[in-house]
Each structure stands twice: as structure tokens, then as C-alpha cells.
Design a protein with these regions (language model features):
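Conserved ABC ATPase signature
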Residues: 63-68, 72
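A short, proline-enriched helix->beta-strand linker immediately N-terminal to the Walker B motif
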Residues: 83-87, 116
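Q-loop/switch helix immediately C-terminal to the Walker
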Residues: 12, 19-33
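P-loop NTP-binding/switch modules centered on Walker-like glycine-rich loops
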Residues: 94-172
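Charged, flexible cofactor/metal-binding loops and thiol motifs
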Residues: 147-218
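Conserved ABC ATPase "signature" region
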Residues: 40-59
């Protein structure tokens, strides 16, 4: 979906691009909607490809989508989106499969390339959601919770939101205690759903049937 005012950046660039048409042809189709003259289209296309990080845009113009890597195809879809006057940018999992540094680079790129457009990010990545102004939590197609990203992700009301945050392997939304200054505190205290004030002061030792544990829980 590449309209004049609304553009969509898909999760998979290869599925979005037409394998039977060159990248030049697909960019030219979008430029025609924007009103770019035929004599200016090659220059305009190279400019957009350069903006998304291609050092040899002329080579990319001659290629087809099946000749591109996944990352290259994704950048071409962003270049296509640039051939618009987007007021709304919809990005479906724009950081899927990327490491943390690449995620930040992608989000920064979208912000710099579309400074005046509203951005709707569809994501399962909490770090991406945290970079947004507002979040909407969906489950089974239903809205369960919405609000500012900082409030929803730090103090969720709905059990589903709480479960999502609690399921994070890195548990990045919680602070890791400083064990040098919090002597005697259970190291899991800040992240444990069963924690009480007692856990801040003691770690009772228990044993049974050859097993040992340091917790008040049976």
C-alpha cells in the first residue's frame, strides 16, 4: 500500500516487491503518482536509494527483488515509501530479526526520513514499543489497554499486559538490584510475583528430602 498520504512498510520486503519488475520500474510507478517528471526520475530514484543507505544506487535500480538480500529488499520498500508525501507511516515489524544496535538505527532512520509523518508501529518487540509515544495492546483482535508508552509499560493495569512484560527473558523493564548495597535481599526480589516486604530483609533457609532453598515459599 503506497498512497500519496498513507504508506505501508511491510515486514517482508521480498513479499511486497514485484519480482517481475525491476527496482527502477517500481520506483518510477511511485514517482508518477507523486508527479515527478520522466526526465528527473532516474536522479530522484538514486537520491531515495542513497537516503536509505545504498552506496551504488544505479546498480540497485537495474536489479530485481529476488537478487536482493532481505535487508536490501526492506530498504527498497522504505525508498518506495519516500516517493510520497506521507502523513501517516504504517510499519509492520520494522525491526524484526535485527540486533539491538540495528533496531535503533532503523527507528532513527524512519524518524529522520519521515519527520512530519505520524508513525504507527506494529510490533511484538517491547523495546520498539517503549520508543513510541503511545501504545495499544491487542489480543485476539481486541483492544485491552492503551495509554502513554512509559505508563503502560511501567505500570500496566490489564493482566495480559503484565504477563507480556513478565514473559521477557531479559526482563528489561525491571531494575536489577545492586547486591553490594542490598545485603541480605533475595536477588530475585524485584522481579518475583510472590515477593513481600520480608524478602527485603531475609532469605530463610529451608530443606526437605535432600533439597535446599532460600525462600519463605514452601
Amino acid at each position: 500500500m503506497l498512497g500519496r498520504d498513507i504508506v505501508y512498510i511491510p515486514q517482508n520486503g521480498h513479499e511486497f516487491l514485484n519480482p517481475s519488475k525491476s527496482i527502477r520500474s517500481q520506483l518510477f510507478d511511485s514517482m508518477e503518482k507523486l508527479g515527478v517528471g520522466a526526465s528527473d526520475r532516474d536522479t530522484f530514484a538514486c537520491e531515495k536509494l542513497s537516503q536509505v543507505g545504498f552506496s551504488q544506487p544505479e546498480t540497485i535500480l537495474r536489479m530485481y527483488s529476488f537478487q536482493l538480500s532481505g535487508g536490501m529488499a526492506q530498504r527498497v520498500t522504505i525508498a518506495l515509501a519516500l516517493c510520497s508525501k506521507a502523513r501517516l507511516l504504517i510499519a509492520d515489524e520494522p525491526t524484526n530479526g535485527l540486533d539491538q544496535d540495528s533496531k535503533q538505527q532503523t527507528l532513527s532512520l524512519l524518524n529522520s526520513l519521515f519527520p512530519d509523518a505520524a508513525k504507527l508501529m506494529i510490533t511484538h518487540d517491547i523495546s520498539v514499543a517503549a520508543a513510541c509515544d503511545r501504545v495499544l495492546v491487542l489480543c485476539g483482535g481486541r483492544m485491552l489497554e492503551t495509554g502513554s508508552a512509559s505508563e503502560v509499560l511501567s505500570s500496566p493495569h490489564h493482566p495480559y499486559t503484565k504477563a507480556l512484560l513478565g514473559a521477557l527473558v531479559e526482563n528489561g523493564m525491571q531494575e536489577t538490584p545492586n547486591l553490594r548495597t542490598e545485603t541480605g535481599v533475595c536477588p530475585f526480589y524485584r522481579r518475583c510475583p510472590a515477593a513481600t516486604e520480608l524478602c527485603r530483609r531475609e532469605m530463610p533457609h529451608q530443606s526437605a528430602q535432600g533439597r535446599e532453598w532460600w525462600c519463605r515459599e514452601e
